[in-house]
Amino acid sequence: MALFTAKVTARGGRAGHITSDDGVLDFDIVMPNAKKEGQTGTNPEQLFAAGYAACFGGALEHVAKEQNIEIDSEIEGQVSLMKDESDGGFKIGVTLVVNTKDLDREKAQELVNAAHEFCPYSKATRGNVDVKLELK
């Protein structure tokens, strides 16, 4: 049973518009390399990067809390659109750059690895999307 379901409607594909059922999201989708001067909007890669970074940050806080560790972290999500040589189409790759600020590197890496196992986005992409984890 779902704990929460997000609902967003997209019209017009990569040159269209998206809206969420609650009205929070309501903006144009534009091709990253085809933006015209003054044109605003986002793209699916930015949206995926935002969602993954936020979700991973929550997972990192969760696994740290389970070990009674207070953590101050920042997650930078990078999502790249790449050519898929296997079928001539496209695929995405993800890099998550994790800055845990004052935490020692060994413990930070342990928590990042645990968060990667726990995070719903990581579970959804596992075996399907190349995901790199970088500790800053």
Curated annotation (Swiss-Prot):
This is Organic hydroperoxide resistance protein OhrB. The keyword Cell division does not apply. It comes from Bacillus subtilis (strain 168). Involved in organic hydroperoxide resistance. PANTHER family: ORGANIC HYDROPEROXIDE RESISTANCE PROTEIN-LIKE. Coiled coil: none annotated. Belongs to the OsmC/Ohr family. One of its GO terms (biological process) is response to oxidative stress. Keywords: Stress response. Pfam families: OsmC (PF02566). The keyword DNA repair does not apply. Disulfide bonds: none annotated. Induction: By heat shock, salt stress, oxidative stress, glucose limitation and oxygen limitation. Expression is sigma B-dependent.
